[in-house]
C-alpha cells in the first residue's frame, strides 16, 4: 500500500468529491435534460450543506449563531480551495465574503458551458449558502450582492443576523 501524506490525501479526496459532484449531474442531464438535472442538484444542495455544517460544528465544538457560522463557513471555504476574503460588517456580527475565484464557475467555463453558469449559480449558490446560514440560526439572512457567473469580478455574499 502506498502511504500518502496528509496533503496528498486531502488532495485526492477533494478531487474525488469535486468530480462526483459534477459527474452525477452530467449523467442525469444526459438522460433527462439540463433543467431536471439542475432541479435534482438543487435538492441535493438543500441537504449537503447541513451535513457539512453539522460535521464542522461537531469537530469544533461550536454551536449556533453568526460567529459560529463565520468560523465554520470560512473553514469550509478554505478547505475547498476557494480564493476569498471575509470581513466583519458593523457591530451585530454581520460579515461579508468576497470570492475572487470560483472553481465551480471555472469548471463550467473550461467545459464550454459558460452560458449555463449563471443558471447554476443563481439556483445552487443561493440554496447552498442559505442552508448554511439556517444551520446556525433561523434568523440569519444571506444576500448575494454580486456573482462572477453574472459577469462580476467577484461573488459577494453578506450574512447578517
Identify the residue ranges that each predicted region occupies.
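Mixed-charge, glycine-accented linear interaction segment located at domain edges/termini
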Residues: 127-129
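N-terminal accessory segment detector
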Residues: 1-123, 134-154, 158-161
Amino acid at each position: 500500500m502506498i502511504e500518502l501524506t496528509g496533503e496528498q490525501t486531502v488532495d485526492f479526496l477533494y478531487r474525488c468529491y469535486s468530480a462526483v459532484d459534477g459527474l452525477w449531474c452530467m449523467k442525469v442531464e444526459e438522460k433527462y435534460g439540463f433543467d431536471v438535472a439542475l432541479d435534482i442538484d438543487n435538492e441535493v444542495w438543500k441537504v449537503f450543506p447541513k451535513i457539512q455544517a453539522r460535521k464542522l460544528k461537531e469537530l469544533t465544538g461550536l454551536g449556533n449563531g453568526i460567529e459560529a457560522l463565520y468560523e465554520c463557513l470560512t473553514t469550509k471555504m478554505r478547505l475547498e480551495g476557494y480564493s476569498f476574503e471575509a470581513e466583519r460588517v458593523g457591530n451585530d456580527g454581520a460579515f461579508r465574503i468576497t470570492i475572487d475565484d470560483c472553481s465551480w464557475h471555472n469548471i463550467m467555463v473550461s467545459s464550454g458551458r459558460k452560458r449555463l453558469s449563471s443558471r447554476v449559480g443563481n439556483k445552487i449558490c443561493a440554496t447552498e449558502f442559505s442552508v448554511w446560514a439556517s444551520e446556525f440560526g433561523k434568523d440569519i439572512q444571506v444576500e448575494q450582492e454580486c456573482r462572477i457567473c453574472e459577469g462580476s469580478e467577484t461573488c459577494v455574499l453578506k450574512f447578517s443576523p
